[in-house]
Regions:
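Edge beta-strand at a domain terminus
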Residues: 121-123, 130-145
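Structural motif
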Residues: 26, 49, 121-123
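Short aromatic-glycine motifs in intrinsically disordered, low-complexity regions
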Residues: 72-78, 125-132
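Bacterial N-terminal signal peptides that target proteins for export
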Residues: 1-7
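Central antiparallel beta-sheet cores of small beta-barrel/beta-sandwich binding domains
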Residues: 29-113
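N-terminal signal peptide c-region/cleavage motif recognized by signal peptidases
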Residues: 9, 15-17
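Cleaved targeting-peptide boundary
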Residues: 20-28
Length: 145
């Protein structure tokens, strides 16, 4: 009886954590070339859509500590990158989050986007692409909260 109770409790915890696995939270992005932290992005959910806003940039002392998006177009042109919403429109589609858009502040381009969590919920693979996701690039973000 005691063993059955332990198994049931473990199953309930596993089920609850699986149901709670969403991209909402604080994520650390990693520089592809150096492996160093690059930024912190806060992902929030509003009306079934996830969006991500840059909360902090990790910059070296010789870099501009408050860079602006000089390559962005429209309303984002020359706006501070810190505080900028770069990920929009992600919606849950089964185990994946799809139909989003992601802005690369380095080149000012907006790409289609999708994302998926690993089994632990501690890593988020974010893919930006043009047209078909085959033609794109992925980054792994690490949960920071």
């Amino acid at each position: 009886m005691k063993r059955l109770l332990i198994v049931a409790a473990a199953a309930a915890l596993a089920s609850a954590s699986a149901m709670a696995a969403t991209p909402a939270g604080l994520w650390k992005t990693i520089d592809d070339n150096t492996g160093s932290p690059r930024s912190l992005i806060r992902i929030t959910q509003v009306n079934g859509e996830y969006k991500g806003t840059i909360e902090k940039l990790f910059r070296t002392p010789d870099q501009d500590q408050n860079p602006k998006c000089d390559k962005c177009e429209g309303a984002l042109k020359d706006k501070p990158i810190t505080g900028m919403t770069i990920l929009t429109g992600l919606r849950q589609d089964g185990d994946e989050f799809a139909d989003g858009k992601i802005l690369d502040p380095e080149n000012g381009k907006v790409y289609s986007s999708k994302a998926s969590l690993d089994g632990s919920g501690k890593k988020l693979e974010v893919r930006g692409f043009i047209g078909v996701s085959l033609f794109g690039r992925s980054q792994t973000w690490v949960r920071a909260d």
